[in-house]
C-alpha cells in the first residue's frame, strides 16, 4: 500500500513538474534566453534538481540543505526545485534527460558510478569495491585537489554536465529476503544491479547473477522474486521500505557510496557570475554538512532497523569479500593505476 501511494504521488509530481518544461527558467522580463551574458542582472532562475531517494535519507537531507543555501547565498535569485523520491526517474533516466538538448532537468545528485556509462573514467575509480576503508578515507579524497580534478572530468570530456561537489551516503551493503550468514550464501542468487559494469563484475565475483532492474521497480522485483537481493546504503534501505520485502542486510560494506551533485552546462551558462559563485559556495557548505550528519544518521537508522526486527548480519572479516572481487579492481584500473593508488594511499 505504501509503495502504491508513493507511485501515485510520483505520477502527480511528474505531471506538475512537466508543466511549462524547458529546464532552467529565468524570471527576468525581456531578458535573453541563451548564455551567461544574457543574464547579467542575475534575474531569478529556477533550477529543477532530481533526487532518486526520499528527503529523509542522508543524500536527501544534503540536497535540501544545498537548495536552502543556494537561495540564501544568491539572495533569492536562484531557486532549486527539488524533485525527490525518484519522481523524475532513475539516475540513468535523469542523466539521459540532462544530456539531451533542451533538458527539463538542470541538476541532480548522482552516484559517482553513474557517470561511468557516460565516459567517466576517473569517477569509475571511486566505485571500485573496497577502495575506501573508512569515511575518513573518503573525505581525505573529497577535500583534496585530486577531487577537484575528478569533478572537472565530465565538463572537460564534453559530456555536457559539470560536477559541483562531493558527498557520501554511507557504505553500501547487500540485503535479501533469504536467511544468509556470510559470503557463501550469496552464490547463485539473482542480485539487482544498475546498468553499471563495476557492479556487474562485483556480483559475478561473488558467484551471484547480476540482474538489471530499474531502481523504481526494485521493490516489486524483490516482492515477486524477480531478484533475490540488492544493495543500498543503510539509510536508503530503510527510507525506500525495502525491509518490508527483504528483511536481512549483511554489512559487507563493499563500496562507499560516493556521490556528487552535477549541473548541465546549459543551465550553468545561463547563470550570472554572482549566481554561479553562490551555487559553488552553497556546494562547499553542503559537502561539509553531509560529512557532519552521515555517521549519526546512519547509526540512528541502523538502531531503528534492529529495533524493528530486521536481521542485521555483521561481517567481522572482509578478506574473503575483498579476494572475491580483486579481479574487478585489477581489470578496471588499467591505464589509471597511479591515479587509483593515489586514492588508496590517502587512507
Locate predicted features.
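Hydrophobic helical h-region of N-terminal Sec-dependent signal peptides
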Residues: 10-15
Amino acid at each position: 500500500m505504501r509503495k502504491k501511494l508513493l507511485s501515485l504521488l510520483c505520477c502527480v509530481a511528474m505531471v506538475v513538474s512537466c508543466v511549462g518544461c524547458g529546464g532552467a527558467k529565468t524570471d527576468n522580463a525581456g531578458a535573453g534566453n541563451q548564455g551567461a551574458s544574457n543574464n547579467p542582472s542575475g534575474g531569478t532562475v529556477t533550477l529543477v534538481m532530481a533526487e532518486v531517494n526520499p528527503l529523509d535519507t542522508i543524500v536527501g537531507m544534503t540536497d535540501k540543505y544545498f537548495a536552502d543555501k543556494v537561495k540564501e547565498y544568491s539572495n533569492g535569485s536562484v531557486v532549486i526545485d527539488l524533485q525527490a523520491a525518484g519522481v523524475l526517474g532513475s539516475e540513468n533516466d535523469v542523466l539521459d534527460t540532462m544530456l539531451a538538448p533542451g533538458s527539463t532537468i538542470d541538476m541532480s545528485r548522482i552516484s559517482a558510478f553513474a557517470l561511468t556509462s557516460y565516459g567517466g573514467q576517473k569517477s569509475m575509480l571511486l566505485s571500485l569495491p573496497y577502495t575506501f576503508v573508512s569515511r575518513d578515507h573518503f573525505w581525505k579524497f573529497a577535500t583534496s585537489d585530486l577531487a577537484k580534478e575528478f569533478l572537472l572530468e565530465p565538463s572537460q570530456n564534453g559530456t555536457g554536465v559539470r560536477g559541483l561537489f562531493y558527498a557520501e551516503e554511507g557504505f553500501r551493503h547487500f540485503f535479501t529476503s533469504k536467511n544468509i550468514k556470510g559470503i557463501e550464501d550469496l552464490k547463485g542468487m539473482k542480485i539487482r544491479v544498475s546498468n553499471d559494469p563495476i557492479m556487474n563484475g562485483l556480483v559475478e565475483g561473488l558467484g551471484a547473477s547480476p540482474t538489471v532492474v530499474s531502481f523504481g521497480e526494485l521493490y516489486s522485483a524483490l516482492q515477486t522474486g524477480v531478484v533475490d537481493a540488492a544493495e543500498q546504503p543503510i539509510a536508503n534501505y530503510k527510507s525506500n521500505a525495502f525491509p518490508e520485502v527483504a528483511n536481512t542486510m549483511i554489512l559487507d560494506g563493499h563500496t562507499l557510496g560516493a556521490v556528487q551533485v552535477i549541473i548541465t552546462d546549459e543551465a550553468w551558462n545561463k547563470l550570472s557570475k554572482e549566481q554561479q559563485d553562490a551555487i559553488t559556495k552553497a556546494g562547499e557548505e553542503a559537502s561539509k554538512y553531509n560529512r557532519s550528519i552521515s555517521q549519526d544518521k546512519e547509526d540512528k537508522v541502523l538502531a531503528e532497523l534492529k529495533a524493528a526486527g530486521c536481521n542485521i548480519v555483521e561481517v567481522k572479516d572482509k578478506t574473503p569479500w575483498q579476494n572475491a572481487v580483486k579481479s574487478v579492481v585489477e581489470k578496471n584500473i588499467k591505464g589509471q593505476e597511479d591515479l587509483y593508488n593515489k586514492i588508496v594511499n590517502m587512507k
